[in-house]
Design a protein with these regions (language model features):
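Short hydrophobic/Thr-rich beta-strand motif most characteristic of the beta2 strand and flanking loop
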Residues: 27-34, 42
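C-terminal output helix
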Residues: 108-117
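Active-site beta3 strand of CheY-like receiver
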Residues: 46-52, 57
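The feature encodes the CheY-like receiver
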Residues: 16, 58, 76, 88
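Charged docking surfaces used in two-component/phosphorelay signaling
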Residues: 17-25
Length: 123
């Protein structure tokens, strides 16, 4: 069986390494990106099974990346879990409006993140 592919997008290198390590331990293939423009290109090229997406990114913010993917017939099926330090209700609402499936606030518990990933990939 082919490994499920997850794209992790965040400009915090250490966080990306930690998430990547945890996901690989669970048996997932992990792609990484540190800016929105690259994330969009990778998502279109690799067609991942799930995207973990930060909001505050260089080049193209997470809201725009999410919106561009969710309003494209070819990619709208990909679950997107937004990860962010933004905790206000208006930020969560904006995340939902762009089509994000889930909104996870930082700092988050890695076990909780892994459970959310499993939930979306087993649907």
């Amino acid at each position: 069986m082919e490994k499920k592919k997850i794209l992790v997008v965040d400009d915090e290198v250490d966080l990306v390494k930690t998430i990547k390590f945890s996901l690989e331990l669970e048996g997932y293939k992990v792609l990484v990106s540190y800016n929105g423009e690259d994330a969009l290109n990778q998502a279109r090229k690799e067609n991942p099974d799930l995207i973990l997406l930060d909001i505050m990114l260089p080049k193209l913010d997470g809201y725009k990346v999410c919106r561009l993917l969710k309003f494209d017939e070819q990619y709208k099926h990909i679950p997107i879990l937004m990860m962010t330090a933004k905790t206000q209700e208006k930020d969560k609402l904006m995340g939902k409006e762009t089509g994000a499936n889930e909104y996870i606030t930082k700092p988050f518990d890695m076990e909780e993140l892994m459970e959310k990933v499993k939930t979306y990939l087993n649907k």
